[in-house]
Amino acid sequence: MAESRWHTFEWDDENRKNGNVQHLRDHDIEPEEAEECFFHDYALARDDRRFDDVYIIDGRTDRGRKLRLVFQGKSNGVARVFTGWELKPQKKRRS
């Protein structure tokens, strides 16, 4: 299991229309699945198009789903996930 810098997660009320929980659910991701990605091996990059504390993580859930998440890394190990989507295997091109 990977050691994560982020171990606490900031979630909006699940009934908030424009909150991060509802936004993830619109992409068929449950908050628990997003959290699981931080506790398995993952690839991490800064999102230079945004602010310094915004990152992209490619991780996997306990059930093996591969997800890409965009989140803000806050102080004291807190992560606020903004959005995410499932990484689908790419089809090989025929030449």
Residue ranges with predicted function:
Residues 1-95:
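Ribonuclease/tRNase effector modules and their secretory precursors
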